[in-house]
């Protein structure tokens, strides 16, 4: 089951986005993820081809790096 989650974040720059993406990859290497920092919501898009996206983990990683996120519906 393929799942895609899109998160609104307050990540503002490419360096911070890179750090967060690397940390997500360390915890969940099967996730395909990217940021769209041009979007007004500073979107983080995550795809998991083998199940659900662990939103709790994503929130924890964002918060650990002093950022916030919310799932876009």
Whereabouts are the PLM-identified features?
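Short amphipathic alpha-helix segments
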Residues: 12-28
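Surface-exposed aromatic
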Residues: 40-46
């Amino acid at each position: 089951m393929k799942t895609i989650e899109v998160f609104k974040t307050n990540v503002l720059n490419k360096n911070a986005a890179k750090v967060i993406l690397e940390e997500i990859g360390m915890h969940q290497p099967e996730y395909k993820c990217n940021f769209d920092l041009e979007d007004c919501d500073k979107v983080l898009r995550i795809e998991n081809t083998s199940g659900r996206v662990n939103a709790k983990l994503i929130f924890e990683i964002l918060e650990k790096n002093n950022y916030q996120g919310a799932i876009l519906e």
